[in-house]
Every structure is written in C-alpha cells, then in structure tokens.
C-alpha cells in the first residue's frame, strides 16, 4: 500500500510539473517557514503537537525547489530532513506544493516508526500575500517505505506561515 502511495505522489508531482506555469513564480523568493500541527492524527497511537521550521530555497532544479527542515513533537520525537518540492501557482494568490523529503527520525518518547530513515511526502495549499509571504495548510505522510518489516507510518496536519528570507533580513 505504501509503494502505491509513493507512486501516486511521484505521478502527481510529474503531472503538476507539466501544468502551465504562471509568471508569478518568476519572482518568488526563498522562505523561512514555521509550522504547527497535529502529529499522528489518523491512527491516534501516539498523537502529539508537532512543530516545524524549514528553509525553502528559491533555487530551482528544473521545476523542483530544494528545502530542508526540522520537526519536533510534544512527545519528544525529532525529524531532520531535506527534499524537493514543486510550487504550482494557481493565479497570483494560491500555491499548491507537493514535496518529498527523506530524513533521520528519532522517536524520543513518541511514536516508533520502525527505522531511523523515514520519508515524508506532503501536499500543501497556501494563500500568497502581496509581500510574498504565505499562509498554508498541509497534510503529510511519513514512513520508512517498507525498507524494513515494521512500517507503521503516520500522518500530520500542519498550519504553515512562510516569510521571505529577505523580509527577515530587512532587504
């Protein structure tokens, strides 16, 4: 089932990449993003508050943008990750961003996901303000993609606020 989910995410990313691109993306900056949400909301085996901090680059590799971040839960779990996302602009205001990121997961006192190497797939929908900052909601799935026998996986629901790095640096 997980392999089918990853194939669906990859297919969706390719289809998004083939969509016509809006000129709004040309001046899109790099971002510092903060997120707060609900970890393991689907299975409720170890539900917790989730906190994220990310750097989202303005550099593009074809249509992919690199990003990296850290996540921590109120139960002591920690995840450090880096990956690629695609910003799909729907006009000047709305952005859909599918992404995938491998990373290192430590359960702490939280949910045991079966292996330190975990993969996070995510779909975010955001509103883009005049200053290019974004307010978005995202659904994430995290699992080890069945590289070991134990692969419980989990989902998160996240509220993001992304600020252009230039705004934070006063440029």
Region annotations inferred by a language model:
Residues 30-32, 60-65, 92-96, 131-137, ...:
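Repeated loop/turn-to-beta-strand initiation elements of outer-membrane beta-barrel proteins
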Residues 55-59, 86-88, 127, 141, ...:
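Residue-level signature of outer-membrane beta-barrel architecture
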Residues 51-55, 82-84, 123, 159:
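Membrane-embedded beta-strands of outer-membrane beta-barrel proteins
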Residues 49, 152-171:
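Outer-membrane beta-barrel "beta-signal"
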Residues 39-49, 71-81, 108-116, 146-154:
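Solvent-exposed loop/turn segments connecting transmembrane beta-strands
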Residues 96-124:
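Mid-chain, well-packed structural core segment of small domains
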Residues 31-40, 63-74, 96-106, 137-143:
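Transmembrane beta-strand segments that form the barrel wall of outer-membrane beta-barrel proteins
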Residues 1-28, 168-171:
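Cleavable N-terminal export/targeting peptides
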